[in-house]
């Protein structure tokens, strides 16, 4: 990824609409859905089991936004950045998908969230899935408690 994404971003002005698959794994969706290993029900026509293809233009936009964050922002309002304590990879479902982020690199979130501004509260959620509030009840209850406590400390 450290070479492919910048390369895709470089060719985007010339080939903005090339469709790129994101993979063929349904493992994360299986972690959420009650019919597999999760506890949730949702419309699979709206929240797909497989991630849809993206375009070179989309990848370039994400990469450029990430570079902006890497270089630092100066957000003046309080920011709460929450992320799991580990990332999970793989094409086949395993129990690890129930306790980690199968979408994002949590090390990058931990590293770069501090670049958002001067009033950043970060929460590393032990055992959190990508959708933290879809994690197991004990995990999401900890997240809710933290969010409400944090909200009570900020003034709008």
Where would I find each of the regions flagged by the language model?
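Acidic beta-to-alpha connecting loop that harbors the catalytic carboxylate
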Residues: 85-88, 100, 128-129
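Short beta-strand/loop motif that positions the catalytic acidic residue
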Residues: 75, 81-83, 96-97
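Active-site-adjacent alpha-helix of alpha/beta-hydrolase-fold enzymes
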Residues: 90-120
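Conserved active-site and cofactor/substrate-binding residues in soluble primary-metabolism enzymes
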Residues: 53, 57, 104-107, 142
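Catalytic active-site module of serine/aspartate enzymes centered on a nucleophile-bearing elbow/loop
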Residues: 110, 116-156
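Alpha/beta-hydrolase-fold enzymes
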Residues: 1-54
């Amino acid at each position: 990824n450290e070479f492919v994404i910048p390369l895709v971003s470089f060719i985007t002005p010339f080939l903005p609409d090339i469709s790129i698959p994101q993979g063929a794994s349904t493992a994360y969706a299986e972690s959420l859905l009650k019919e597999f290993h999760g506890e949730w029900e949702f419309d699979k026509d709206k929240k797909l089991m497989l991630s849809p293809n993206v375009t070179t233009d989309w990848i370039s936009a994400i990469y450029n936004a990430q570079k902006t964050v890497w270089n630092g922002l100066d957000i003046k309002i309080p920011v709460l950045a929450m992320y799991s304590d580990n990332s999970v990879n793989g094409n086949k479902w395993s129990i690890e998908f129930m306790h980690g982020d199968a979408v994002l690199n949590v090390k990058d979130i931990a590293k770069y969230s501090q670049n958002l501004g001067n009033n950043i509260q970060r929460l590393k959620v032990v055992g959190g899935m990508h959708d933290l509030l879809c994690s197991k009840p004990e995990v999401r209850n900890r997240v809710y408690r933290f969010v409400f406590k944090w909200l009570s400390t900020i003034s709008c």
